[in-house]
Amino acid sequence: MSGNTFGKLFTVTTAGESHGPALVAIVDGCPPGLELDLQDLQRDLDRRKPGTSRHTTQRQEADEVEILSGVFEGKTTGASIGLLIRNTDQKSKDYSAIKDLFRPAHADYTYHHKYGIRDYRGGGRSSARETAMRVAAGAIAKKYLASQGIVIRGYMSQLGPIQIPFKTWDSVEDNAFFCPDPDKVPELEAYMDQLRRDQDSVGAKITVVADGVMPGLGEPIFDRLDAELAHALMSINAVKGVEIGAGFDCVAQRGTEHRDEMTPQGFLSNHAGGILGGISSGQPIIAHLALKPTSSITTPGRSIDVDGNAADVITKGRHDPCVGIRATPIAEAMMAIVLLDHLLRHRGQNADVSVNTPVLGQV
């Protein structure tokens, strides 16, 4: 199976299945001398891990990460950083009834046709369990980017039909939804409680923002920064759409509205989401991602078995009724991996570039 590595200079390779003994990652290209300890990684892993509220899967995984290499006396050495998280709460028997069935809207059918063999336990390699390693690797990238003045944060901006206006970052870490509006939390909780009673699932929208990014990151033509961000975010399980800045709303905008006019005091708007011509402008980089409802629900769904016979599928086991609830740290991680990769690429070619034009902020 190819396609397990992301990045060019800062690279992340992951391996492991949902019900295998462990998940692993190799992170290569991290600059030496970065102070790094387990807590730097564990902090974000704890934000993503399952079983932290009644609104997520009740699978109990500590997601305790081990650093196997690349860190000595509390600092990165420049060597590959090996990471490991052991799986401890697998219940594979929950999936024995569907081992020869294809869950509708899941990767079962496509994996079967592509490889001719698949690990049906918890979705195997296609499970979102894999994203734990992305979060661990992304935490390394976030730590280095923070040393360069770049801060990456995310929040839930919609759950099902409920739009969530941004009010304050202070609220995001105080609830299970990463919700930036504390007044919306009771409505979200009530909606999720009813969803469980309905034995159904729902989608969500996540917004992720990078502040402090300098102008110049991005490699036209084919490695535009927004193209690579879209690639990274679309690679997250259940993501079916990505927008940068105004995204699809720009269709209804006129040029006089959409263009981000500049004054000596700064940009007057940020419809471009901080990226112009595939290169960062120095404004906040803003991306939105849409996650579909999970297909692993207990309401029967029509499908087929491996022989093509009609079948009704009921997925037992422990699943997230809304995968978007735990997606914010994953989106942050993928944005961080992209930005650090492009920061290192920019240094390699353009470290000596200097212009007299001031760097504009946001008015």
Curated annotation (Swiss-Prot):
Subunit structure comment from the entry: Homotetramer.
Residues where FMN binds: R125, S126, S127, N237, A238, G277, K292, P293, T294, S295, S296, R318
InterPro entries with a match to the protein in the record: Chorismate_synth, Chorismate_synth_AroC_sf, Chorismate_synthase_CS
Broad enzyme group: lyase
GO cellular component: cytosol
Superkingdom of this protein's organism: Bacteria
Pathway connected to this protein: Metabolic intermediate biosynthesis; chorismate biosynthesis; chorismate from D-erythrose 4-phosphate and phosphoenolpyruvate: step 7/7
Disulfide bonds listed in the record: none
Keyword field contains Secreted: no
Reaction(s) catalysed by this chain's protein: 5-O-(1-carboxyvinyl)-3-phosphoshikimate = chorismate + phosphate
Cofactor-binding details, from the entry: Reduced FMN (FMNH(2)).
Binding annotation for NADP(+): R48, R54
Coiled coil: none
PROSITE patterns the record matches: CHORISMATE_SYNTHASE_1 (PS00787), CHORISMATE_SYNTHASE_2 (PS00788), CHORISMATE_SYNTHASE_3 (PS00789)
Cofactor needs: FMNH2
Function summary: This reaction introduces a second double bond into the aromatic ring system.
Protein name from the UniProt record: Chorismate synthase
Enzyme Commission number(s) from the entry: 4.2.3.5
GO molecular function, one term: FMN binding
Pfam family, one: Chorismate_synt
Keyword list, A-Z: Amino-acid biosynthesis, Aromatic amino acid biosynthesis, FAD, Flavoprotein, FMN, Lyase, NADP
Family listed: Belongs to the chorismate synthase family.
